[in-house]
């Protein structure tokens, strides 16, 4: 099951705000950007934005990757602190990988960023 609407970042301005902080962590499969939510955002939970470029492949391949990332994120969402906006950028290597590898690599990059343990790195 995918990420529900209140848990998604949809506005371009929200994506740009997270990218502007220049807090990024990466591995071979993903680049993760994170930022605390601004006061205007009236949610008390994390939000996720996914970016899957045309370098990944055709539309059906990009949707496949988005679904796998979303499912993996939902499986580990209990470990994500509230009031955090996270943007995940998929790299081309993620295409065609098994769900287990995608989830493990997503956990790895979120751990590098200090997001999983609730101590976000600067």
Curated annotation (Swiss-Prot):
InterPro entries reported for this sequence: Ribosomal_Su5_D2-typ_SF (IPR020568), Ribsml_uS5_D2-typ_fold_subgr (IPR014721), RNase_P (IPR000100)
PANTHER family reported for this sequence: RIBONUCLEASE P PROTEIN COMPONENT (PTHR33992:SF1)
Reaction catalyzed: Endonucleolytic cleavage of RNA, removing 5'-extranucleotides from tRNA precursor
Metal-binding in keyword set: no
GO cellular component, one term: ribonuclease P complex
Protein name as it appears in the record: Ribonuclease P protein component
Alphabetical list of HAMAP family matching this protein: RNase_P
Organism: Oenococcus oeni (strain ATCC BAA-331 / PSU-1)
